[in-house]
Amino acid sequence: MSAASLYPVRPEVAATTLTDEATYKAMYQQSVVNPDGFWREQAQRLDWIKPFSVVKQTSFDDHRVDIKWFADGTLNVAYNCLDRHLAERGDTIAIIWEGDDPSEHREITYRELHEEVCKFANALRGQDVHRGDVVTIYMPMIPEAVVAMLACARIGAIHSVVFGGFSPEALAGRIIDCSSKVVITADEGLRGGKKTALKANVDRALTNPETSSVQKVIVCKRTGGEIEWNRHRDIWYHALLEVASSTCAPKEMGAEESLFILYTSGSTGKPKGVLHTTAGYLLYAALTHERVFDYKPGEIYWCTADVGWVTGHSYIVYGPLANGATTLLFEGVPNYPDITRVSKIIDKHKVNILYTAPTAIRAMMAEGTKSVEGADGSSLRLLGSVGEPINPEAWGWYYNTVGKQNCPIVDTWWQTETGGILISPLPGATALKPGSATRPFFGVIPALVDNLGNLIEGAAEGNLVILDSWPGQSRTLYGDHDRFVDTYFKTFRGMYFTGDGARRDEDGYYWITGRVDDVLNVSGHRMGTAEIESAMVAHPKVAEAAVVGVPHDLKGQGIYVYVTLNAGEEPSDALRTELRNWVRKEIGPIASPDFIQWAPGLPKTRSGKIMRRILRKIATAEYDALGDISTLADPGVVQHLIETHKSMSAA
């Protein structure tokens, strides 16, 4: 390994860090040798109503997968994120909200946030929402979205946040799956100067007869735009708050009671409702937030994710607020009104820690130094990356141009299902290698296995698995425990299968190589190929579709679709555009195909399985690396696809 690619821990970071290398090694060792003792001690960072006596009861045996942490303890998540901070830091800023328009921002103290959460919790109770009921939150990035999440947690309701970029059809599917009782939305969202019709999307979603579980729609006024109103069903958020009491006792919740459901893409098409519970999740989010970001009281922390994704749940809301941090909530996008927006926000709010995605970094990098022109940036102390592996080139640009070579980068690897960061450098303990997620967090035991499930030792490449449970782990898929077991524990028995491939180097550092299943990673967001294929095939002119990921300069992975049309249908540029718009409507803009190639037939095995491996190679013009195609039902299809791809590339 060349010395140039290693960035040792900076002495000034090591001097002030919460976790230096010796501490990391000692704590990690204890966490894997004596998990009960380690997590019993760490759990003291939470305020318990009834202390737990048992720490860890977990089994990865695929006949009885069962995950419980601190099972007999009770507590309340909202109390841990709000009430317990009031005496010491009630007047500390909890949330800095930065609007889409740079002229708009708000600062909300812990005391103010606590009051609004209590009022809205009472308002929800007034709408017959109680412990165990599911509430769908389909909101822009405004403080009321965080209020809604914490209000649910306060009364023991389960929230299901759906990203505001999802279509009415996708929203309806996520409402139906969890029999949601109430939907909370806004009249419109604002993002990059454009309005999104959130309330209209909810109205459309609720025309689906299977969404009849929804009794009320609570609407927050964001733009004041024209919306349709159903006076039997719709209620204004502000009207509810005006009459609500600001006193609301937090509900005593069991450690293993449900906190939230978050839908993530699966390889079979139907989105999976990942279920997280109360104590283990909160403890893990708080501990990882403190240690990975080396968070110190009074610092300004900005995670650029959307609350509709797990990163927003764990590292905008629950982790930072449990730690009494100041968390920045940004409504807009990194390039609006122009590409300097991120640096301007950093300077305006004196941001110390920036946690963003490689997609945003690549978008800024594409503009050279323009994105940091006129910026000071001296408040920054630490940079983070999340959502997909960051390529070394983007890492170097982020380190040199945004961090001015003064800020360590924590390149974090984790998933919706893991609740929090599993593999990441700790800034005061880990020498950095651009592109590597480096070492496991406390209590996390990663391993590599071959395709037969045999453990591979030393420097090697293989399937990434985790050998034992950690408190932030998802407990099940909502209403479908069999699918949970099949997806994560059947492939490699007795292990949690991440769906990712990884390489381990001679220093024991992990390098994530990408998905090994049929899931794409577009701009840091997971999307199942089956979900896009299903949407495409639902179009009346399409007979069959196959989706593969291809490298994309900005998004990381682009969406490449092979389409077979029904007999009698003619391919055309107009139809290409129509199909793109169709997928946008079915799933959302995020799933819009980057490339559509017409395919008279697809390469299939004799059993009818589409050979995606071949399609991936053709899409990236690796025509000589197709491997053995003699087993295909019709090998002639391949040459035709290659010719079409060549003519597309030439055009």
Curated annotation (Swiss-Prot):
One of its GO terms (cellular component) is cytosol. Mg(2+) binds at residues 537, 539, 542. The modification N6-acetyllysine is found at residue 609. Acetylated. Deacetylation by the SIR2-homolog deacetylase activates the enzyme. It catalyses: acetate + ATP + CoA = acetyl-CoA + AMP + diphosphate. GO terms for biological process: acetyl-CoA biosynthetic process from acetate. CoA binds at residues 191-194, 311, 335, 523, 584. Its cofactor is Mg(2+). ATP binds at residues 387-389, 411-416, 500, 515, 526. Pfam families: ACAS_N (PF16177), AMP-binding (PF00501), AMP-binding_C (PF13193). PROSITE patterns: AMP_BINDING. InterPro entries: Ac_CoA_lig (IPR011904), ACAS_N (IPR032387), AMP-bd_C (IPR025110), AMP-bd_C_sf (IPR045851), AMP-binding_CS (IPR020845), AMP-dep_synth/lig_dom (IPR000873), ANL_N_sf (IPR042099). GO terms for molecular function: acetate-CoA ligase activity; AMP binding; ATP binding; metal ion binding. Catalyzes the conversion of acetate into acetyl-CoA (AcCoA), an essential intermediate at the junction of anabolic and catabolic pathways. AcsA undergoes a two-step reaction. In the first half reaction, AcsA combines acetate with ATP to form acetyl-adenylate (AcAMP) intermediate. In the second half reaction, it can then transfer the acetyl group from AcAMP to the sulfhydryl group of CoA, forming the product AcCoA. Belongs to the ATP-dependent AMP-binding enzyme family. This is Acetyl-coenzyme A synthetase.
